[in-house]
């Protein structure tokens, strides 16, 4: 005889939340799913370049390999852009 009630509760209208707002609904075993990145703000889908560093990994990599910080890389690009506009 199979065991009864061994499967988790299924929520057919689970809310996916990104940055405090509901971005979509889906089926899940959790009533709410909190995400940092989704297709609406991912650089691949939006066409923008943005460094998302929630745990300091990019800065740690830049320091380890002597490349400065992630912010200095973007500031160099902005400085070059200003110089080319003159």
UniProtKB/Swiss-Prot annotation:
Would you tell me the Gene Ontology cellular component terms? ribonucleoprotein complex; ribosome
- State the residue spans of region: Disordered: 65-86
**Keyword vocabulary terms for this entry:** Ribonucleoprotein, Ribosomal protein, RNA-binding, rRNA-binding
Record Pfam families: Ribosomal_L31 (PF01197)
Family annotation (PROSITE patterns): RIBOSOMAL_L31
| Top-level division of the source organism's lineage | Bacteria
InterPro entries reported in the protein's UniProt record: Ribosomal_bL28/bL31-like_sf, Ribosomal_bL31, Ribosomal_bL31_A, Ribosomal_bL31_sf
Where composition is biased (Basic and acidic residues), the residues are 76-86
Q: Which NCBIfam families match?
A: L31 (TIGR00105), PRK00019.1 (NF000612), PRK00528.1 (NF001809)
Q: How does it assemble?
A: Part of the 50S ribosomal subunit.
The free-text function statement in the UniProt record for this protein reads:
Binds the 23S rRNA.
Protein name (database record): Large ribosomal subunit protein bL31
